[in-house]
Regions:
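Conserved short loop/turn motifs at secondary-structure junctions
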Residues: 219-224, 369, 450-452
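N-terminal alpha/beta PP-like core and its mobile active-site loop of ThDP/TPP-dependent enzymes
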Residues: 2-347, 383, 387-390, 470-473, ...
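Active-site diphosphate/adenylate-binding microenvironment
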Residues: 9-13, 17, 35-39, 356-436
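Generic enzyme active-site microenvironment
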Residues: 165, 307, 395, 448-449
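Active-site nucleophile and cofactor-binding loops and adjacent substrate-binding regions
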Residues: 27-29, 52-63, 78-85, 140-141, ...
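Phosphate/pyrophosphate-binding active-site segments
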Residues: 1-3, 143, 206, 302-398, ...
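Short, internal active-site loops enriched in acidic
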Residues: 170-173, 401, 548
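Thiamine diphosphate
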Residues: 106, 114-121, 316-318, 324-326, ...
Length: 571
């Protein structure tokens, strides 16, 4: 039977369809126009397959794809042109690589005959992208498109997830080929799901069974592996208290009795202090980043360290491991749990409460229940979290707004935190929230931003307007680049070198885009205006006038051990 002859652009549409893609974030341009022409036939009428979201900047397309992937568990897709269109996505690609987020970036390229000639909007995208993604590939023949797309999705979502970049020369889009679907089930020299080592499983279980003061560190690997139930079974059988990384905050429900709080530089006092008192430390799907460990030379030296991860390169990279368990935590956790003896650690768990009470009295009550002065970020977060009853998705930008909203937001459901953890990308929040709204349209998405971060992606108000994206935006406006200002106060003698912000009139900007807006300047109006925001259909911008010199505590200073965490900052 004669096979159907189609263009490369049509082949791309079919390959994406076969991967189950429904949503694409993109921006057209010269070198990708044939693909967008093919896309036109798949976005309307009886043949509608894709929902294309026209962003206002290609970096936003990548971040939106990240947000979509984080909350949905599916691969996010963005489609852009060559040259600046492609390079604009690279911050998002690097961000996705750092945070193990599965996205596929498809970029146009000049024709093969023009490669290397410095043609208009030409860039060696594969060469630039290779160090910051799992796989970068230039598709030089239309008959390779189905294979390359299938391989890209397999690599992006398997093992430790991450970004893939496909470079598509213009003639590959217009040349024809016989259509042949493809399905990738393995890639040579790539082993995304290693077989569990029985000896490592037994060694880990033996250490845990002998532990008097075990402590688990729960990372995003639990979310990526969909191992939430396996985690609960593990923790509850052995009665192990747990701290959560920034990216792992919704891997364990906030109010679970074994949840002791957030890890890290601005995490919970108890989780940081008790890291230095445990006798067995169990790291689950986390990478011991510098923001968690403080000074690595002093980190948990008294403890035996068990590290569960799907990526062998993380073992002994930052912290010396006594037992390394390589594999997907959805398999490794139940394998260990089966060998555990039921245990109780009541006194050990109670000792966390002592530190938690100190933090509550000296930090939390002041943050969320202030009685006078300007609004604080903590009280705004607390009111929004209470109003959404822990059911919302939290998306935040980078800086003080990120730390405070992550500290005080409550999580009941999995895949509920979307943040730029490893790369710390300002401007991430707004486009990521747009992507999250399309990833889980049935859930409320709350996006916390500072006045610095919002202005790095404020053009995406256009996307929100056009698509009527129902994102609830909370702008914490302290008229400063607050996190940098705090460090300037701590380390540079209060010399505020270019960190004070002259802000535009956000009411006028919101009005120009047709987005409902309100502002809170008095805390007596806060709850009412938050409830109004949440009850208003569609998008909403709520600006909160925040105390300009508010600091984020607790804080572990750079170069300090985690048990040197401060509950107050003294200048």
């Amino acid at each position: 039977m004669t096979k159907e002859v189609i263009t490369g652009s049509e082949a791309l549409m079919r390959a994406l369809r076969d991967e189950g893609v429904k949503t694409i974030f993109g921006y057209p341009g010269g070198a990708i126009m044939p693909v967008f022409d093919a896309l036109y036939g798949y976005t309307g009428g009886e043949n509608k397959t894709f929902n294309h979201i026209l962003v206002r900047h290609e970096q936003a397309a990548a971040h939106a794809a990240e947000g979509f992937a984080r909350v949905s568990g599916r691969v996010g897709v963005c489609l852009v042109t060559s040259g600046p269109g492609a390079t604009n996505t690279l911050t998002g690609v690097a961000d996705a690589m750092m945070d193990s987020t599965p996205i596929v970036v498809i970029a146009g390229q000049v024709g093969i005959g023009a490669l290397g000639s410095d043609a208009f909007q030409e860039v060696d995208l594969v060469g630039v992208a290779q160090p910051i993604c799992k796989w970068a590939y230039q598709i030089r023949r239309p008959e390779d498109i189905a294979w390359a797309v299938s391989r890209a999705f397999y690599i992006a979502k398997s093992g430790r997830p991450g970004p893939v970049v496909l470079d598509l020369p213009k003639n590959t889009q217009t040349d024809t080929c016989e259509w042949q679907p493809a399905k990738t089930t393995n890639v040579r020299s790539y082993d995304p799901y290693p077989t569990l080592d029985t000896q490592a499983i037994e060694a880990a279980a033996q250490l845990i069974n002998g532990a008097k003061r075990p402590f688990a560190l729960v990372g995003q690997g639990v979310e990526l592996g969909n191992a939430h139930e396996e985690l609960l079974a593990f923790l509850e059988k052995a009665d192990i208290p747990a701290g959560r990384t920034l990216l792992g905050l919704s891997a364990l429900a906030s109010h679970h009795p074994l949840n002791m709080g957030m890890l890290g530089m601005h995490g919970s006092y108890a989780t940081n202090m008790k890291t230095q008192e445990c006798d067995v430390l169990i790291a689950i799907g986390m990478r011991f980043s510098d923001r968690v460990t403080g000074t690595p030379e002093t980190y948990a030296k008294q403890a035996k360290v068990i590290h569960l991860d799907i990526d062998a390169s993380e073992f002994d990279k930052n912290i010396k491991t006594d037992v390394a368990v390589l594999g997907d935590c959805k398999q490794s956790l139940p394998a260990i749990t089966a060998l555990l003896q039921p245990a109780e650690h009541k006194e050990w768990i109670a000792s966390f409460k002592d530190y938690a009470e100190q933090e509550r009295l000296r930090v939390i009550e002041k943050d969320i229940h202030p009685t006078d002065g300007p609004l604080l970020m903590g009280e705004v977060t607390h009111v929004v979290s209470e109003a959404t009853r822990g059911e919302a998705v939290l998306v935040n930008d980078v800086g003080q707004n990120q730390m405070i909203s992550s500290r005080y937001f409550t999580f009941k459901q999995k895949r509920s935190i979307v943040t730029s953890g490893g790369f710390g990308t300002m401007g991430f929040g707004l486009p990521a929230a747009i992507g999250a709204c399309f990833g889980v349209p049935h859930r409320t998405v709350c996006c916390f931003m500072g006045d610095g971060g919002i202005q790095m992606s404020i053009q995406e108000f256009g996307t929100i307007m056009e698509q009527q994206v129902p994102v609830k935006m909370i702008l914490l406006n302290n008229t400063f680049l607050g996190n940098v200002r705090q460090w300037q106060d701590l380390m540079f003698g209060h010399r505020h070198s270019f960190t004070d912000m002259l802000n535009p009139n956000y009411a006028d900007i919101a009005r120009g885009y047709g987005i409902p807006y309100d502002v809170v300047t008095d805390r007596k109006d806060l709850k009412m205006k938050v409830e109004k925001m949440l009850s208003t259909p569609g998008p909403y911008l709520l600006e909160c006038a925040i105390k300009p010199d508010e600091d984020i505590v607790p804080m572990t200073l750079p170069g300090k051990s985690v048990d040197e965490m401060l509950l107050e900052l003294h200048y």
